[in-house]
């Protein structure tokens, strides 16, 4: 209520009273004064009510909408990021200065640029296609021709069996230095070289990439003995099998690597050798399962006790102390092993 509104009501607030001694008696208002008083009060309410109502609504909106605004703020930021990523392919066509951002750029923008440049490997693989080579400029044609060289060197290292990531990374670095870095396609080729060095760490992904580029060449390099009728899926499986079990077959049999790549049957034989469980072996190395060590009878479905490091596999009722021959099948928590010999509690105490 402002001062002007109060002045309008002031004449009606003064009540007429007759002072008789110390007591004051209130005189009731006349109907005319009561009507004027009510009209003035209604006029003031009409002026102040919308303003006070809007103030209350604004305060209520602040209290109720503040938590929702805090929840919606990261959602708005995510939408802005999606819009920026749609524009980023145009930024990739700029010189490779984006790979070295200025100090003024924030960390979030640098992460977006780096992520966008590395993520699409499929777009870079399409550069090798002859259709795009015909549409590109002569400079880009030279750089696109350099890309298959990088990809073709990867199966060469795998064919020799060396697969040294440091040597391959040095070769890729030499090729990337020869390429011009000023053109936009040069930046993509540099990123492509980095992707190839990263793929060398995982042989399976490297194999799949080479298969996409040139399947016939891969079958000639890595699996020379396989016929041309074998489909691409079986070729990939054969390559992975040879790569995985090559070292184990060389150590166990001492045969050269080429002997294991002669035919698919030799690959399956090497797989069967590698898939054998480790506990299987010759009778001299490990005890024959199914025959009791003490009574030399078959164990079959009876409860058995097996101690592999001692060469014991026996019935539960045949298990006994190695000194006093006391049955120890029900006393497994009281056995002691000293110098590869089973002792009961009493025999073990006699040692000290």
UniProtKB/Swiss-Prot annotation:
InterPro entries for this protein: Cell_Prolif/Cornif_Regul, Znf_LIM
In-chain residues carrying the UniProt-annotated modification Phosphothreonine: 137
Polar residues bias locations: 61-72, 251-268
Region (Disordered): 1-73, 86-121, 251-287
Location of Phosphoserine modifications: 18
Compartments, record wording: Cytoplasm, Cytoskeleton; Cell junction, Focal adhesion
Presence of the UniProt keyword Zinc in the record: yes
Keywords associated with the record: Cell junction, Cytoplasm, Cytoskeleton, LIM domain, Metal-binding, Phosphoprotein, Zinc
Every LIM zinc-binding domain range: 292-347
PROSITE patterns in alphabetical order: LIM_DOMAIN_1, LIM_DOMAIN_2
Domain of life: Eukaryota
Tissue: Expressed in skin, kidney, ovary, testis. Also expressed in brain, cartilage, heart, lung, spleen and thymus.
Chain intervals with Basic and acidic residues compositional bias: 272-287
GO CC, any one term: cytoplasm
Alphabetized CDD domains for the sequence: LIM
Gene Ontology terms, MF aspect: metal ion binding
Function: May be involved in the regulation of cellular proliferation and/or differentiation.
Protein's name according to its UniProt entry: Zinc finger protein 185
Source species of the chain: Mus musculus (Mouse)
């Amino acid at each position: 209520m402002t001062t002007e509104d109060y002045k309008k009501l002031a004449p009606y607030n003064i009540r007429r009273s007759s002072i008789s001694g110390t007591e004051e008696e209130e005189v009731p208002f006349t109907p005319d004064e009561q009507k004027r008083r009510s009209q003035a009060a209604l006029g003031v309410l009409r002026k102040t009510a919308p303003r006070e109502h809007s103030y209350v609504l604004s305060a209520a909106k602040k209290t109720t909408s503040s938590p929702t605004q805090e929840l919606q703020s990261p959602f708005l930021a995510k939408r802005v990021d999606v819009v920026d990523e749609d524009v980023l392919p145009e930024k990739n066509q700029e010189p490779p200065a984006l790979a070295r951002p200025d100090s003024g750029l924030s960390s979030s923008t640098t992460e977006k640029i780096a992520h966008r440049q590395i993520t699409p490997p499929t777009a870079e693989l399409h550069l090798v296609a002859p259709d795009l080579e015909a549409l590109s400029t002569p400079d880009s044609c030279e750089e696109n021709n350099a890309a298959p060289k990088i990809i073709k060197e990867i199966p060469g290292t795998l064919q020799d069996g060396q697969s040294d990531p440091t040597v391959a990374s040095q070769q890729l670095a030499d090729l990337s230095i020869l390429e011009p870095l000023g053109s936009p396609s040069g930046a993509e080729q540099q990123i492509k070289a980095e992707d190839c060095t990263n793929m060398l760490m995982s042989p399976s992904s490297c194999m799949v990439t080479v298969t996409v580029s040139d399947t016939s060449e891969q079958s000639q390099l890595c699996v020379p003995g396989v016929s041309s009728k074998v489909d691409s899926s079986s070729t990939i499986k054969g390559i992975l099998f040879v790569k995985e079990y090559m070292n184990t077959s060389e150590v166990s049999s001492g045969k050269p690597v080429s002997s294991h790549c002669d035919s698919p049957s030799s690959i399956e034989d090497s797989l069967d050798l590698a898939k054998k469980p480790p506990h299987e072996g010759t009778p001299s190395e490990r005890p024959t399962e199914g025959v009791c060590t003490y009574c030399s009878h078959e164990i079959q479905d009876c409860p058995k006790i097996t101690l592999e490091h001692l060469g014991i596999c026996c019935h539960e009722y045949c298990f006994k102390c190695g000194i006093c021959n006391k049955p120890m099948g029900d006393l497994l928590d009281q056995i002691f092993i000293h110098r590869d010999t089973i002792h009961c509690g009493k025999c073990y105490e006699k040692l000290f």
